[in-house]
Amino acid sequence: MQTFFVEIKCALGKTYEVASALAEAEIASEIHSIAGHYDILAKFYAPQGVVIGHFVGEKVQTIPGIVDTRTIIAFKAF
């Protein structure tokens, strides 16, 4: 499994709608509201062979209310 995180910037007033849509899609293992340049931090696990860029583009960025994302790929958990 590949672990990665996506920081998500939402349209104004849409953070909770986006978080709910992510939860309903059952694609993220964790979803957190955060402070800073982005509104949500979501943790994902992808099976080997899944292209993370395609996954984010097709499954995450298509959720209404998302205006920007930043993907962080994790190497090892300690």
Give short role names for the model-derived ranges.
Residues M1-F78:
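A compositional/biophysical signature of low hydrophobicity enriched in polar/charged and small residues
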